[in-house]
Amino acid sequence: MPTLYVRRVNLKDSLSDAEVVAYWKFLQEEFIPVAMKVPGTRSVKLYSGAGGLRADIILLAEMDDAGVYERWLADPGVSAMVAKVYSAWDMKTATQVFRREVTPELIRALSST
């Protein structure tokens, strides 16, 4: 079932401007291309709110199903980068949610008796 993974984070206040720029380059140039290779990953995009690329950052990953997240964690390329991805986050403010796409199939499954 098509799933949207949403991760909302703020970067740590202790990061310098240079570290923030390097982190964004890492996400764009290294992490996203590797995550996109995991079967079932449809898209991975990053969005920033009004926090100047430091706060109110949202990662949106469109996946074939919620199991793709577990495949990310099991994938050697992605798992090798997880610590670096998380290292810049203020984990006190980080949140994540999974959302199912409302499809005719989902409606039929939920309405059948």
Regions inferred by a protein language model and the residue ranges of each:
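An amphipathic, aromatic/His-enriched active-site/gating alpha helix that lines ligand/cofactor pockets
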Residues: 26-42, 60-100, 113
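A short beta-turn/loop motif at secondary-structure boundaries
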Residues: 47-54
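Basic/polar N-terminal segments that are highly enriched at the extreme N-terminus
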Residues: 1, 111-113
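Acidic, low-complexity intrinsically disordered segments
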Residues: 101-107
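Active-site-flanking beta-strand signature of metal-NTP-handling nucleotidyl enzymes
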Residues: 2-11
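Short, conserved charged micro-motifs
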Residues: 15-22, 68-72
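Histidine-centered divalent-metal-coordination microenvironment in nucleic-acid enzymes
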Residues: 56-58
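Short coil/turn motifs at secondary-structure junctions
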Residues: 12-14, 51, 64-66
